[in-house]
Amino acid sequence: MWCLPKDDSKAVITAQDQIHSAHRECHLQLPETAILFFMGKATDYLISQYNATELPEPLPRFLNSCPIWEIGKFQLCFADGGRGAPQAVDTIETLAALGVRNIISVGMCGAYDEVVHVGEIIAPQKAFVEEGTSLHYYEDIEYSKPDGNLQKAVTSLLGIRNYSIVSTDAVYRQTLCKEQLWRDKGAVGVDMET
């Protein structure tokens, strides 16, 4: 029982509820664009290199609030997106409830195809869904795709290549058989947040 097409009942808790809960009252004013990092030291680098300012309140997501920073001259904010699909979606829904409209996710994937080299930056053209969180949002979904305009801009600006990946939440269930099925679909790597 995942996404029920005829279920129009209210959610028990929403990101908006979390933001304005009895535990806290959030007054964050965020820019329209946020960058989420799903890897360790990326936020530390931006803080040191771009004179980022930590906002006075943490991002009040349900699964562990976290600091959020702003780089004023770029009209964007950034934060750690968490680990795994549930925390990624929690972060995205919280940002959306706070008025953020554009979210760019930056993370790492484990490549299992030699066409991708260690340290290479790629832009996923498709992310095949192998995790459970997406199934709470879509009745039937095989893969997700990024915004086409953003995909083109990032690819041309950074001079990177596009490949398909797989997003999973079962680290220890990546079998050689599954890997071959993913390769047959054109995927070159696997992550946990896309």
Feature locations, PLM:
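Accessory terminal and edge-of-domain segments that mediate assembly/interaction
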Residues: 1-104, 110-194
